[in-house]
Regions:
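Membrane-interface helix-loop junction between the first two transmembrane segments
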Residues: 22-41
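P-loop potassium selectivity filter motif centered on the GYG triad
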Residues: 198, 204, 305-315, 405, ...
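Hydrophobic alpha-helical transmembrane segments of multi-pass inner membrane proteins, especially
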Residues: 65-294, 334, 338-392, 419, ...
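A juxtamembrane structural motif centered on a specific transmembrane helix
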Residues: 389-485
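TM-adjacent membrane-interface loops and short helices in multi-pass inner/ER membrane proteins
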Residues: 288-329, 333, 343-344
Length: 485
C-alpha cells in the first residue's frame, strides 16, 4: 500500500509542477491584463501548496514519524504569513517572483527532509531569518537614498570580508570558504557578492569612460584574485562573469566580453597547472570513470542518480541520495532527479529561468540607471549560480562547489538569496510607484478641471436669465395659442 501511494504521488507531483511551470511563462501572454494575471497567480499558489502537501504526505507515510506533520504545519504557517504580509504592505511587489521563491523553498524543505530531518530543521531556522530580511529590505530600499553614494564602502567592506576568510578561514575540500564562530559557520563570499554588484553599479552609474572602467576593473580584479588565493574558484568564476556581463551591458562593446572569455580560458589553463584540486576537477569532468575511485566519485554518483531516476524518478524515500557526497549542497539537483524525476528537475530549472527573466525584464524597465545596473548584476549572479550548480552536477561543466539558490542546504547561501529576492521586490515596488503616482496625478488633474468647468459655467453672466428667457417664450406660446383659439 505504501509503495502504491509513493508511486501515485510522484506522478501527481510531476503533473502539478508541469502546470505550475507552464503558468510561469503563460503569464507573459497577458502583460496588460491584471485580472487575468491575478487568476494565474492564485492558480500557481494552489498547485504549489498541493505539491508541498503531496511531498510531506509521502514522507510521513514512508516513515510514520509524527515530527514530519508538525514540521509541515510550521512551514505552511510561515509560507501563508509571507503572502499575507506581502499582500498587506507591498501591493506592487512581483507576484511571480514571490510565488517562485516560496515554490523553491517548498521543494527545498521536501528534499532536505527526505535526506536529513535535522538539516531540514536547521534550514527552516535560516528560512525564518531570511523571511525577516525579505520583509524589511523593500521598505529600506524605498526609504534609503544613499545607496548609489556608498561606492567605496561597498568595495572596502567586501574586500575585508574576503580577506578575513583568506587569513583565518576554515579550509573545506581544498578551499577556504567560511568563518567559524562556535557551532555557526558563515560564508562571507555569499554576502560580498551583493556588495560587489552594488560597487560596480555605483561606478557605472557615475560614468562609463575609460578611466572609470579601468578603476572598476582593477578593484573587481582584487575581489576575484582574493577568491582565487582562497582556492574558491567557483566563487571567482561567479564574480568575474557578473562583472563581465555588467560591463558589457553598460558599454555595449562586444570586444570587452570576448576578451573576458579569453581571459577565463587562460585562467583555467593556469589553474589546471597551478592548483592540484583544479586539475582533479577537470580530470573528473573530462573522464570521471577513469578516476571513479578518487576525484570522479562525486560526478559519477551524481550521473548514476540522474540516469537511474529517469523521467519520473523512484519516488520520495525510494532512492539512494545519501550515496552522493555533499548531496544536500552541491548535488541537490541529482537527488531531486533520482527521486522526483528528470521531468520535475527540468521544471525546477525552468522556474529558475522564469525568475531571472523577470529580473532582467525589471532591469530593462528601470528608469534609474543605478538600479538598472543593480538588477542586472543580481540577475546575473542568480543565473550564473544556477548554471554552475546544474552544470557541475550533470558534467556540463567542471564541478565548482556552488549551491542551487533557495534549494540547496546552507544558511549563508539561503540568506543571501532571500536578500537578493527582497532587493528585487524593492525595485519592482520602486518601478511601479511612479506609474501609480502618475495615475493618481492624472485623476486629480481631471477632477480639478471638471470642477473648474462647473464653476465657470455657474459664474457666466446672464446664464440663469437666458435659461428663464428660454422658458418664457414657451409659456407665452401657450397663451397666444389660447387667445387665437
Amino acid at each position: 500500500m505504501v509503495h502504491l501511494i509513493v508511486q501515485l504521488s510522484k506522478y501527481i507531483m510531476i503533473i502539478l509542477f508541469l502546470i505550475y511551470t507552464f503558468l510561469c511563462f503563460h503569464l507573459f501572454k497577458y502583460p496588460d491584463k491584471p485580472k487575468k494575471q491575478k487568476h494565474i497567480y492564485n492558480l500557481q499558489r494552489f498547485y504549489m501548496f498541493l505539491i508541498h502537501l503531496d511531498g510531506f504526505l509521502v514522507l510521513f507515510v514512508t516513515t510514520m514519524d509524527t515530527k514530519i506533520i508538525g514540521f509541515y504545519i510550521a512551514q505552511l504557517v510561515l509560507f501563508e504569513s509571507i503572502y499575507l504580509i506581502y499582500h498587506k504592505f507591498y501591493k506592487n511587489a512581483s507576484e511571480l517572483v514571490l510565488n517562485n521563491m516560496v515554490m523553491m523553498l517548498c521543494i527545498s524543505m521536501i528534499i532536505l527532509t527526505r535526506i536529513s530531518f535535522d538539516k531540514a530543521l536547521r534550514q527552516f531556522v535560516f528560512v525564518l531569518a531570511g523571511t525577516i530580511f525579505a520583509f524589511l529590505i523593500p521598505l529600506i530600499m524605498q526609504k534609503g537614498t544613499m545607496f548609489r553614494k556608498l561606492t567605496w564602502t561597498y568595495a572596502g567592506v567586501g574586500i575585508l570580508g574576503l580577506l578575513s576568510v583568506l587569513v583565518v578561514g576554515v579550509a573545506s575540500r581544498g578551499a577556504k570558504l567560511s568563518l567559524t564562530f562556535g557551532p555557526v559557520s558563515i560564508q562571507p563570499s555569499e554576502f560580498v557578492k551583493i556588495l560587489f554588484v552594488f560597487f560596480i553599479a555605483s561606478m557605472l552609474y557615475k560614468s562609463t569612460d575609460l578611466k572609470q572602467l579601468a578603476i572598476t576593473s582593477g578593484v573587481s580584479a582584487v575581489f576575484v584574485l582574493i577568491l582565487v588565493a582562497s582556492n574558491d574558484l567557483g566563487g571567482a568564476l561567479l564574480y568575474f562573469f557578473t562583472y563581465l556581463v555588467m560591463i558589457y551591458v553598460a558599454t555595449k562593446k562586444f570586444y570587452i566580453f570576448a576578451g573576458g572569455l579569453s581571459f577565463v580560458g587562460l585562467g583555467m589553463y593556469a589553474g589546471y597547472h597551478l592548483f592540484s584540486h583544479v586539475k582533479n576537477r577537470i580530470v573528473a569532468w573530462l573522464d570521471p570513470l577513469s578516476v571513479i575511485d578518487k576525484a570522479g566519485y562525486q560526478v559519477c554518483q551524481s550521473l548514476f542518480a540522474i540516469g537511474t531516476g529517469g523521467l519520473f524518478g523512484f519516488g520520495l524515500g525510494q532512492g539512494l541520495p545519501n550515496k552522493i557526497p555533499i548531496v544536500s549542497k552541491d548535488f541537490i539537483i541529482a537527488a531531486i532527479s533520482e527521486e522526483m524525476g528528470g521531468i520535475f528537475a527540468v521544471c525546477l530549472i525552468m522556474v529558475c529561468v522564469s525568475c531571472f527573466l523577470m529580473i532582467f525584464n525589471l532591469s530593462m524597465q528601470m528608469k534609474d540607471a543605478f538600479y538598472k545596473y543593480v538588477a542586472l548584476g543580481l540577475g546575473s549572479v542568480y543565473a550564473l549560480q544556477v548554471l554552475l550548480t546544474v552544470g557541475g552536477s550533470t558534467k556540463f561543466i567542471p564541478m565548482t562547489g556552488v549551491t542551487l539558490p533557495l534549494v540547496s542546504y546552507g544558511g549563508s547561501s539561503l540568506l543571501s538569496t532571500m536578500i537578493i529576492f527582497g532587493m528585487i521586490q524593492g525595485m519592482y515596488i520602486m518601478q511601479a510607484a511612479p506609474e501609480k503616482r502618475r495615475n493618481i496625478d492624472d485623476k486629480r488633474r481631471k477632477d480639478h478641471e471638471t470642477k473648474n468647468r462647473q464653476k465657470q459655467t455657474a459664474k457666466e453672466p446672464g446664464a440663469q436669465g437666458s435659461q428663464q428667457r428660454r422658458r418664457k417664450p414657451a409659456a407665452g406660446g401657450k397663451n397666444s395659442t389660447k387667445t387665437q383659439k
